Amino acid sequence: MIILNIVEMIVLFIFILLSVAYLTVAERKTLGYMQRRVGPNIVGYYGQLMAIADALKLLLKEIIIVRESDKILIIISPIIALCFALLSWAVIPFSPGIAIGDMNYSLLYILVIGSIGVFGTLLVGWSSNSKFTLLASIRSTAQLISYELILTTNIIICILLNNTLNLNSFIDNQQTIWLILPLLPIGIIHYIARIAETSRPPFDNVEAESELVSGHMTELSASPFVLFYLQEYNNIVIMCFLNIILFFGGYLFWLPFIDNGSNLINFIINYFNINNFNFIYIIEIIFYVINISFKSIILTYGFIWVRASFPRLRYDLLVNLCWVIFLPLLFSLLILIPHILYIFDSFNIYN
């Protein structure tokens, strides 16, 4: 049983790393088409092997470390950041009953694990012995802490409506209506905060490409740089999956003629005259995984479209957006929504 769990984790992490790698290719191709150019198109068919070529190039390069820096911490920091980013996948449900760890406090687990990853950013900034990386890591940490407060407040509001911390229960409660419909403003704020939390454009204030400053990764090269890069794109994917689970019904379909996928799955089973129970279960899993993945791909492409469309915000505007606009608005909603639920005696709107 232990060996089977280890194999499941390894297979899941391999698929995650492959999806993260090809997200970089999708981003470069999308940005190319939006800027009226082709993008990567040499390595493989239409540039589909560009991710493998980039990975090999960066992994085979020499690791150059600043002489006066703490060499051990520079190597450990990206490993810490990537490992804690990957650990968040342990509680993500891809279909009914398909998750490495289905715990009752899975949402709290994701919040805690996601907060620990910021230590990698702090450590690499402090250990690089460079003012650029130190200042960038401090600014990045301040930004992450600020917008984690926004995300946590959003999630508390969702918990008030669902009365649970279990992600599978979140999905089951949305069989009748997705949470994005009653909480549309909170869903929009949540998505904006997700972009800021991952330090993506237009919130990438720690970077300055024209001055060759890449935030806390300025002094990194080769494999440490790759690990931080993987951590950034992994955070994009995991946050899109979490957004889908919280607001868009997770792996559930929500169309009258599909009826959460059961009618479509039954049609396929009857059409091909499938009687094997295990095979039917596999078909259901495939449909649910495709559904949640398709929803997440749409939100992930939203990150790319925002990057190509909007200019970078000034740092003071970024901070004011969090502390002056979003936070007072969410705190007022956090006070208002429990009162409304108490008045109508419906602290769990789905029961």
Swiss-Prot record:
It is found in: Mitochondrion inner membrane. One of its GO terms (cellular component) is mitochondrial inner membrane. Belongs to the complex I subunit 1 family. Signal peptide: none annotated. It is a multi-pass membrane protein. GO terms for biological process: aerobic respiration. It comes from Wickerhamomyces canadensis (Yeast). The chain crosses the membrane at residues 1-21, 46-66, 72-92, 106-126, 141-161, 176-196, 238-258, 279-299, 324-344. Keywords: Electron transport, Membrane, Mitochondrion, Mitochondrion inner membrane, NAD, Respiratory chain, Translocase, Transmembrane, Transmembrane helix, Transport, Ubiquinone. One of its GO terms (molecular function) is NADH dehydrogenase (ubiquinone) activity. This is NADH-ubiquinone oxidoreductase chain 1. Core subunit of the mitochondrial membrane respiratory chain NADH dehydrogenase (Complex I) that is believed to belong to the minimal assembly required for catalysis. Complex I functions in the transfer of electrons from NADH to the respiratory chain. The immediate electron acceptor for the enzyme is believed to be ubiquinone. Its EC number is 7.1.1.2. It comes from the Eukaryota. PANTHER family: NADH DEHYDROGENASE SUBUNIT 1 (PTHR11432), NADH-UBIQUINONE OXIDOREDUCTASE CHAIN 1 (PTHR11432:SF3). InterPro entries: NADH_UbQ_OxRdtase_su1/FPO, NADH_UbQ_OxRdtase_su1_CS. It catalyses: a ubiquinone + NADH + 5 H(+)(in) = a ubiquinol + NAD(+) + 4 H(+)(out).
